[in-house]
């Protein structure tokens, strides 16, 4: 596997640019934690990377989420690891929070709690979360703009309310001999023949 690409923020390369990195936090689908590390160890680690890391808030949220600060993260459930990753991201104090399938592995109550955290930071400190998800309904109550990626490119980028009114999923079986060329004027994302 050979991946080629770059990431620019404010027209600056992110790679090895500490000022730009300090403004962005990434929560992957499978969060990484220090080997044998605890939540406390992760807090100390991220305090060294993110100058605006709010340790007091992290400690308070850790208690609210009932996550033990001295327990090894490797013993946490998948949902607990996701919660910890979100708390670290929120408390990093960055302008941007990049999230990959952040709500996967969280129970419904915890999903709402995490959404409330995001909404609070959007309102209080103008946080911009960028959330990748296969579940658009999951994001309706916290997102106002949606971009759809398809085959490595941006298929569309729209205000969520506009998108709800103008985009429809239609699945149909066409008679033999009818192909996509017969459907001119319709923006087709995917066709499948059997």
What would you call each of these model-derived segments?
Residues 97-101:
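Catalytic Walker B motif of ABC-type/P-loop ATPase nucleotide-binding domains
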Residues 28-84:
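ABC-family P-loop ATPase nucleotide-binding domains
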Residues 113-194:
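ABC transporter nucleotide-binding domain
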Residues 11-25:
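ABC ATPase NBD coupling module
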Residues 1-10:
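Single conserved hydrophobic/aromatic residue that forms the stacking wall/gate
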């Amino acid at each position: 596997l050979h991946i080629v690409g770059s990431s620019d923020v404010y027209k600056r390369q992110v790679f090895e640019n500490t000022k730009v990195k300090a403004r962005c936090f990434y929560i992957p689908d499978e969060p990484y934690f220090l080997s044998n590390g605890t939540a406390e160890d992760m807090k100390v680690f991220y305090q060294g990377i993110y100058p605006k890391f709010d340790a007091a808030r992290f400690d308070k949220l850790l208690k609210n989420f009932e996550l033990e600060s001295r327990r090894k993260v490797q013993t946490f459930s998948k949902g607990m690891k996701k919660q910890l990753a979100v708390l670290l991201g929120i408390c990093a104090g960055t302008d941007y929070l990049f999230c990959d399938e952040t709500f996967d592995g969280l129970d419904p109550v915890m999903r709402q709690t995490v959404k409330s955290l995001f909404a609070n930071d959007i309102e209080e400190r103008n946080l911009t979360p960028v959330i990748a998800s296969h579940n658009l309904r999951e994001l309706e109550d916290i997102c106002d703009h949606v971009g759809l990626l398809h085959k490595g490119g941006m298929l569309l980028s729209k205000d969520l309310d506009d998108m709800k009114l103008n985009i429809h999923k239609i699945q149909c079986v066409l008679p033999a001999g009818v192909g996509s060329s017969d459907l001119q004027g319709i923006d087709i994302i995917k066709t499948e023949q059997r």
